[in-house]
Regions:
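Short acidic-hydrophobic, aromatic-tinged amphipathic segments that line or gate anion-handling sites
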Residues: 45-51, 123-127, 158
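Active-site "cap" helix and flanking loop/linker of ATP-utilizing ligase/carboxylase catalytic domains
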Residues: 247-269, 287-359, 372
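Generic C-terminus detector
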Residues: 369-374, 378-428
Length: 428
């Protein structure tokens, strides 16, 4: 079988890599893909934009590709699943109505409240004066969020009321474009963030291994938010007891409420949780797709064939699938970024050492890379590479990832040297 994977990041390289491990998958076509998918055996890139739904459907139908797996949230929010389904294609990813769970934080918050899902106290505003009046009745720190899609950068944790007011002004003045037509203001929760990604066919929902990522650009979890600078799985803080509660109090309630709204949600439901020191948790947000870079660690540990799970979700037979099988191991990913990210950065820097990193035992997933005119792999984004290590424990997995990343060079390359630092402190 052939599969079309939509997207060009590290998540999509990991999806293509995992799919190609199956003897049932002959070829993966990535739209538009990156330097890693361009050079991976069994994979090819198709240079179309992720919103060229007509072009994708035409190519898939002409080339006997029955299955489309959608990586990023933007095409899901634009209705790629609805469009391709009308052409007779099988699509993994929720319909446009379901993708609102990520595309509008206000919509997701209302859904959680209706479903009885534990979440932070919040209020929604469509103009700045009322928003500022509200924060003056609350206390800092307080969280200000652009309502719509902002590539993971539309959340500001304001430590003072002045910072909160500035964030409100920035959002309403268009810093995040149409994502900032309204704001969600939320109480600031303390604890550790955990990513619980789950697969659902609209009736049954099965969690994957819980993961944690490092969102801040700087070591010690400082500086600006990013799309994620590293991740590890399985997250020790997500105990079996906590995961059992997440299943009943979050995942099942959310899918039931989506059904109540007439939404047949099939694909990934990703719950971002804040877990307090006492073990209680609340949902910070939902995403409608695989996380990045969490996917890279989760799929590295998955033994069940990915296409079997994807097709079971699409065909609504997930309940009949056997329990998911996992490697008895730990995984860690370190992101190599362009200097200046998440601000301004340069592209087109030649990358060396990729083969050496893999020979050292790391898995190298490409994110912001491409082939230049002389077939060299060069940088093409803020987050460039995701170097992933596996091991019997986190110490081994993290060491493997860092052994790999030390083989890689490009101009102004930056990576955090403390991914998983809290785990190493616990293990030692």
């Amino acid at each position: 079988m052939k599969v079309l994977v939509v997207g060009n990041g590290g998540r999509e390289h990991a999806l293509a890599w995992k799919l190609l491990q199956s003897p049932k998958i002959d070829q993966v076509v990535c739209v538009p893909g990156n330097g890693g998918t361009a050079t991976m055996k069994g994979c090819q890139n198709l240079p179309l934009a992720v919103d060229d739904f007509e072009g994708m459907s035409k190519y898939a139908l002409e080339n006997d590709i029955p299955l489309v797996v959608v990586g990023p949230e933007v095409p899901l929010a634009q209705g790629i699943t609805d469009f391709l389904q009308t052409k007779g294609l099988k699509v993994f990813g929720p319909v446009q109505a379901g993708a609102q769970i990520e595309a509008s934080k206000a919509w997701a918050k209302a859904l959680m409240e209706a479903a009885g899902v534990p979440t932070a106290k919040a209020a929604v505003f469509t103009e700045p004066t009322a928003a500022k009046n509200y924060i003056r009745t609350e206390r800092a720190p307080i969280v200000v969020k652009a309502d719509g899609l902002a590539a993971g950068k539309g959340v500001i944790v304001a430590q003072t009321l002045e910072q909160a007011e500035t964030a409100i002004d920035d959002i309403f003045q268009g810093q995040f474009g149409s994502a900032g037509n309204s704001v969600v203001i939320e109480e600031c929760l303390l604890g550790q963030e955990v990513s619980v990604l789950a697969l659902t066919d609209g009736l049954t929902i099965r969690p994957l291994l819980p993961a944690q990522d490092h969102k801040r650009i700087g070591e010690g979890d400082t500086g600006d938010n990013t799309g994620g600078m590293g991740a590890y799985a399985p997250a020790p803080i997500a105990t079996p007891e906590l995961m059992a509660r997440v299943q009943t109090e979050v995942l099942e309630k959310t899918i039931a409420e989506l059904r109540n709204k007439g939404i047949d949600y099939r694909g990934v439901l990703y719950a971002g949780l804040m877990v307090a020191d006492n073990g209680d948790f609340k949902v910070l947000e939902f995403n409608c797709r695989f996380g990045d870079p969490e996917t890279q660690v989760i799929l590295s540990l998955l033994e069940t064939p990915l296409e079997d799970l994807i097709l079971a979700c699409i065909d609504q037979r997930l309940a009949a699938m056997p329990p998911l099988a996992w490697k008895k191991a730990s995984a860690a990913t370190v992101v190599a970024a362009s200097g200046g990210y998440p601000g301004n950065y340069e592209k087109g820097k030649v990358i060396t050492g990729l083969d050496a990193a893999q020979l050292a035992g790391a898995i190298v997933f490409h994110a912001g890379t491409k082939l230049n005119s002389t077939a060299e792999i060069v940088t093409d984004g803020g987050r460039v590479l995701n170097i992933t290590g596996l091991g019997e424990d986190f110490q081994q997995a993290i060491a493997q990832a860092y052994t790999g990343i030390k083989e890689i060079q490009f101009s102004r390359m930056y990576y955090r040297r403390d991914i998983g630092h809290c785990l190493l402190n616990e293990e030692s």
